[in-house]
Design a protein with these regions (language model features):
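N-terminal beta1-alpha1 ligand-phosphate binding loop
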Residues: 1-15
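Short Asp/Glu-rich motifs
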Residues: 30-32, 77, 142-143, 176
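Helix-loop-strand module that forms the ligand-binding subsite of alpha/beta enzymes
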Residues: 42-135
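Glycine-rich phosphate/pyrophosphate-binding loop and the adjoining helix
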Residues: 47, 129-194
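A short beta-strand-loop structural module common to alpha/beta enzyme folds
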Residues: 17-27
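Cysteine-cluster motifs in flexible loop/terminal segments that predominantly coordinate metals
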Residues: 27-59, 185-194
Length: 194
């Protein structure tokens, strides 16, 4: 996973874009309990795994890349738990709204497209434009040493970074030109069972 991120970072650095990598794979991440404490306090009730710090940093970020290894044909459980809590506790997605997002999946063989689909759901519900590349945002390899050998995958990461840069610059140019964001209607909350 880091090989793909590092390939993108090279492009970001070359274009003067600051990045920060936050790894969640090496520590336990609690899942969202939907206790709604964050709705009252603005912070998740769990405070020891970096989610609240990430949500705070997200306010100032211009774009996001969420990358995951693929386990059993889906993203890692940790990234799901992290993103569920980050998005749920971020004040109606305000920290993410109208900022480009990209999902990246790394696998030995299968499950990458299902993983990308799952991660892209976060972007859709938060009104985030989704960045794509010249192929699906995936790299293949069993080990970190294998990933750079996936020439098409590495090229896809470089092009993805270029597309993210372009999108972020377009949004910045729009702000400077006075183009307002859409006036989103207040969301209705409808249950299927009445």
């Amino acid at each position: 996973t880091m090989a793909a991120i590092e390939e993108m970072e090279k492009v970001f650095r070359a274009e003067g874009i600051e990045t920060e990598v936050i790894q969640v794979g090496g520590k336990p991440i609690a899942d969202c309990l939907q206790c709604n404490v964050c709705g009252k306090t603005g912070k998740c009730v769990f405070t020891d795994d970096g989610v609240n710090e990430f949500v705070e940093k997200a306010k100032d970020a211009d774009g996001f890349v969420f990358a995951t290894p693929v386990y059993f044909a889906h993203p890692s459980g940790r990234i799901f738990d992290f993103l569920d809590r980050a998005f749920y506790s971020s004040n109606g997605y305000e920290n993410f709204k109208f900022k480009p997002g990209a999902a990246v999946a790394i696998a030995r063989r299968g499950g990458t497209t299902a993983s990308l689909d799952a991660l892209n759901k976060y972007f859709g519900i938060a009104q985030m434009p989704t960045a794509g590349s010249t192929y699906w945002n995936m790299v293949h390899g069993l080990t970190a040493e294998d990933a750079p050998k996936d020439e098409e995958g590495m090229q896809t990461m470089r092009n993805l970074a270029k597309n993210m840069i372009w999108m972020m610059r377009c949004f910045e140019a729009g702000k400077k030109a006075g183009v307002p964001y859409p006036d989103t209607e207040k969301q209705f909350c409808t249950n299927f069972i009445r």
